[in-house]
């Protein structure tokens, strides 16, 4: 991950952009976002990383931009009034919405500069999806999910509570339903990650 952090810091050399590493998983992601908010008071937060993809139209190296986000490993019961849904933290939205202005800019980038960009639901959990069975269990609850990761929704929740606009970019590293041993994921880091993160730089330059 240190290599990827150096790559991102090289991409974003402006004093107006701060690049930080959160680490893997929901707690690390939330703590990283909160520290950034407390120290730098950002106008917005953009999360960049990789994710497993879902859908016939999704391929490795494509980019999924969050239109909405939720957890795939949270269940707080149904509540007395049956309002709480699977994936929802009780008292918070069923799904966290990406910032509309940033989402609009991201949608304008579709098919530009060779980028294949999809917008949709990103689901998050502390679970590395390395088998078809794991992926099927997630998609059973969230068939409309475009990507599955371990950080995005935790950052979205932190930003929601702090009233900071948020969006997540996830480069598709593998398609779990087409991969049996996580080989796509490891090949991704060896071959195409350097090029793929250029999409986030292009997005920042549009803001």
Region roles according to the model:
Residues 32, 101-108, 192-203:
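Short, well-ordered amphipathic alpha-helical segments that serve as non-catalytic structural scaffolds
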Residues 1-41, 58:
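N-terminal short beta-loop-beta anion/metal-coordinating cradle
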Residues 128-177, 181:
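A C-terminal functional module that forms or caps the active site or interfaces directly
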Residues 176-207:
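His/Asp/Glu-rich mid-to-C-terminal helical/loop segments that flank catalytic regions of hydrolases
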Residues 55-142:
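Mid-sequence, gly/pro-rich, charge-dense loop/helix-turn segments that line enzyme active sites
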Residues 34-39, 57, 156-165:
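Alpha-helix C-terminal capping segments
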Residues 43-46:
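Structural motif
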